[in-house]
Amino acid sequence: MAIQTSNLGYPRIGLQREWKKTLEAFWSNKINEEQFLTTMKEIRLQHVKVQQEKGIELIPIGDFTYYDHVLDTAYMLGFIPSRFSEFTSYLDVYFAMARGSKDHVASEMTKWFNTNYHYIVPEYEEGLQISLKDNRPLRLYEEAKQELGVDGKPVILGPYTFLKLAKGYTQEQFATILKQLVAPYVQLLSELHAAGAQIIQVDEPIFASLTKEEVQQAKEIYEAIRKEVPNATLLLQTYFDSVEENYEEIITFPVSSIGLDFVHGKEGNLNAISKYGFPADKTLAVGCIDGRNIWRADLDEVLTLFTTLQKQVQTKDLIVQPSCSLLHTPIDKTEETHLSTELFDALAFANQKLEELVLTHSALTQGTESISNELETYRNVHHTIRSSAARNREDVKAARTALKEEDFSRPLPFEKRYELQQVALKLPLLPTTTIGSFPQTTEVRQTRKEWRNGIISNEQYEQFIEKETEKWIRYQEEIGLDVLVHGEFERTDMVEYFGERLAGFSFTKNGWVQSYGSRCVKPPVIYGDVAFINGMTIKETVYAQSLTEKVVKGMLTGPVTILNWSFVRNDIPRKEVSYQIALALRHEIELLESSGIRVIQVDEPALREGMPLKEKDWDAYITWAVQSFLLATSSVANETQIHTHMCYSNFEDIVDAIRALDADVISIETSRSHGEFIDTLKHTTYEKGIGLGVYDIHSPRVPSKDEMYKIVEQSLQVCDPKYFWINPDCGLKTRRTEEVIPALEHMVQAAKDARSLLKTNA
């Protein structure tokens, strides 16, 4: 039996975020197209070279992108909306689809399954000519071969997942469009095979959550492709969960290899293999190293997995690989020497995970004695972090044990609370507000950097933050907003900021991962028990409130979002970590309230993304996610108004969960998803305060008043005006001042027009 090492995908952003910087330099016209393409090629080849040097045998090619791999596939197959037809060059079309332009609305963006990565949603239009517009995987395969002598493994997004992620067609059209994808995929695979590709990875992550009928439909497409390309060696790759429910059918697909996730889908996939075996004529690609977290693998557990598999599987060959693409992990931990030894030793970023694959391969091919020293090191590291004082706090354990049922609910029901809040807050019909953050200008970022580097004092930094806060309080008053925010100028990131002020968190210097486009985030590391230390937002919020007679809302990030946007310890259930965060936030909310803050927003944009892929697992997750929010927010007085915010989700799946949060007001992204949540509300009722975002903040274009008014008008057809709020889709941190002010002025004017119409019709 041959055993090979493989990787499913490598982080794109570069060790020092060179990829991000190159993109942004190109967008701002600081470099030309030739310089852009040259630099991107250098980064791309460097990533291949690193994997080659680490000892990976099957190196992914084509996982690199200028923005998003789903967008790459859409462009490649000709899924280009007609509104972009005036653009002629590849990059102009590509980036217009991703980012929009002054006159063109960008394609929708949403979460990649249950991760914090966003993809550009492919759009189908009637009359679309589906064809292989550009065989990008072939070009990149030949590039790696010619430049580095690497016979790589092309990686493509599979036809079924691609079309399932697309929008713009009816369910009745799906089968027809799916068949139209056969020809371009046949051409793509034929050309790769003819060029010498030994194995081609076809990603089908959606296979973890398909019905029996859908799997059969997918199989027919693969049979049609195989008929035309009989000799190509295809690796059907699944990840993010098991394919247990459809395993028996999936192993009959006409492919040479099947990749399964034995980290996040371990139990289900092992159960399926135990029940149905594995085809002797296929290669099993074993996802055994976690591609979504940053902890060292338990190599003893990994080797036990292979022992189990080798007893049950008479497979042709084995492939040792991560559970999914390493896109979701930082690149290398070597710069994180500021961390404690016990934490540093416990980490494994992308490059370290490649080393773990090679260690596993050595143990499997040469015996465990060949890595005996490494195994002993790993065991010691795991023992040290498990027994750490940071993971065994008695006060945190006691607080969790003391929780009672009444800690998870507000004293009065929503209708009675809202009446009291209206009396206390004296807000107009259709109140306007923003989601929280205002532009983080170059000056803001530079001043924060100088403060962190000790160039300016704490006092100077605080004075600067107060100056920015006052400036934007005045802007908001002049614009005419009803509920103001302080602007969050002191915050780098909505999760990092809180993590820096809570026990149990640690932070990397260079642990960046891609969120969307050039936007990178540096998730906190939750390594110990989480606990409140001191007030985190009191000073800035109270100062902002002192500057105005209008209501200023406190701004917090919710427990589930902090959890889902962090790298989380893996020694206790995520539910328990979420409850720890909720208890810490509960303390902060009580301090805000006692300081005179009457509206407090607790953002949960990541609540939906944490849901398991399989519907059967949803209830358990939603129960503890909702309970976490309630635990954080339920101790305030009835007169205190609790807001929350969500963005980029398939909300129809969680309307009941949103209702169960019992927030007085929820604001939801609406504009970029082209009003999908409005459609959801046509089929269900939502009886609490709600604001459906009226403009897309991820695009630089300033929408007109009429565009926003149209969304307000549509929203009021399904929402009670008494409970309706008007707000942007999301925070305005990444936009420029000259974009924000006119957009908010248009929004306020749209609100005034809507109020006038309601009064006229009353």
Curated annotation (Swiss-Prot):
Pfam family, one: Meth_synt_2
Active-site residues, as the UniProt record annotates them: H698
Cofactor: Zn(2+)
EC annotation from Swiss-Prot or TrEMBL: 2.1.1.14
Protein's pathway: Amino-acid biosynthesis; L-methionine biosynthesis via de novo pathway; L-methionine from L-homocysteine (MetE route): step 1/1
One annotated GO biological process: methionine biosynthetic process
Cofactor remark: Binds 1 zinc ion per subunit.
Molecular function via GO: 5-methyltetrahydropteroyltriglutamate-homocysteine S-methyltransferase activity; zinc ion binding
Binding site for L-methionine: I435, G436, S437, E488, D603
Positions annotated to bind L-homocysteine: I435, G436, S437, E488, D603
Record keywords: Amino-acid biosynthesis, Metal-binding, Methionine biosynthesis, Methyltransferase, Repeat, Transferase, Zinc
Residues engaged in binding Zn(2+): H645, C647, E669, C730
Record field: catalytic activity: 5-methyltetrahydropteroyltri-L-glutamate + L-homocysteine = tetrahydropteroyltri-L-glutamate + L-methionine
Binding residues annotated for 5-methyltetrahydropteroyltri-L-glutamate, in chain numbering: R17, E18, W19, K20, K111, R519, C520, W565, E609
Described purpose of this protein according to its UniProt entry: Catalyzes the transfer of a methyl group from 5-methyltetrahydrofolate to homocysteine resulting in methionine formation.
Family, as annotated: Belongs to the vitamin-B12 independent methionine synthase family.
Name used for this protein in its record: 5-methyltetrahydropteroyltriglutamate--homocysteine methyltransferase
Taxonomic source organism: Bacillus cereus (strain AH820)
Biological classification of the source: Bacteria, Bacillati, Bacillota, Bacilli, Bacillales
Gene label: metE
